[in-house]
Amino acid sequence: MKGIIAGAVLGLGLISQSHAEVLIDVRNDTSEDCSLAVNARIDKTKWITQGWYVFASGEEAPIILKDINDIHNVYIYSDCKKNVTSPKTETKKAWVKSNYKFKDETPRDKEQGYEEVVFERLLSDKYQIQN
């Protein structure tokens, strides 16, 4: 009987891990509307890039990333912070769709309608857009 209960508890633990989510609280402290794109590891070999999340000036709202297990493997790009990166910040290049909402699980290197941008590693579950 104890074996059945232990197996059921272990099974529930595995099911809950497969439906992991990361919640990021975002606040736009700029005077303009800003868009965010996210690049995150979904398993040991795959990355997902998705966007655009639009935040009006002064807006604060969460982003929920489904199927992401670890917030330490999340990178963010903001179109309001182009080329403004601290030398100490870890960065990663990836391709984003220029004008439309997207969710890509395969790299889109040099495809028409995509541009390469520099993502910054997310350091906590809060992200503040500043000029």
What positions do the PLM features span?
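Sec-dependent N-terminal signal peptides
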Residues: I4-S16
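Intrinsically disordered, low-complexity segments enriched in small/polar residues
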Residues: S18-D29, D33-I68, Y75-N131
